[in-house]
Amino acid sequence: METKIKLYGTERCHKTQYYKSFFENKNLSYVFLDVEEDEINAIELRNLYENKKLNFPTITISGKKLRNPSEKDLNKWINKLL
């Protein structure tokens, strides 16, 4: 079964670290995809955007793409899609 929550980012990005903590504090299963350490993750992230840029942090929840969402928006989509 495919992971429902994916977090694209880097270890050195403070916003990425915020989302990692957010998911862990809510006991949500997610996969972290480091776009600096793994070129496949970078390509996957680029393919989510028309401009093909590394727009991180990006979160996908059951296929819904969220670019640097607010906590309110993130909670809304988690409740709606999970």
Q: Where in the sequence are the language-model features?
A:
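Local sequence-structure signature of Cys/Sec-based thiol-disulfide redox active-site neighborhoods
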Residues: 1-29
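Glycine-/small-residue-rich active-site loops that bind phosphorylated ligands and cofactors
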Residues: 14, 37, 66
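Short alpha-helical
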Residues: 14, 40, 73
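Alpha-helical elements of the RecA-like P-loop NTPase motor core of helicases
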Residues: 17, 21, 43, 75-76
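Thioredoxin-like thiol-disulfide oxidoreductase module
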Residues: 35-54
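Non-catalytic, surface beta->alpha helical segment in thiol-disulfide oxidoreductase systems
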Residues: 61-82
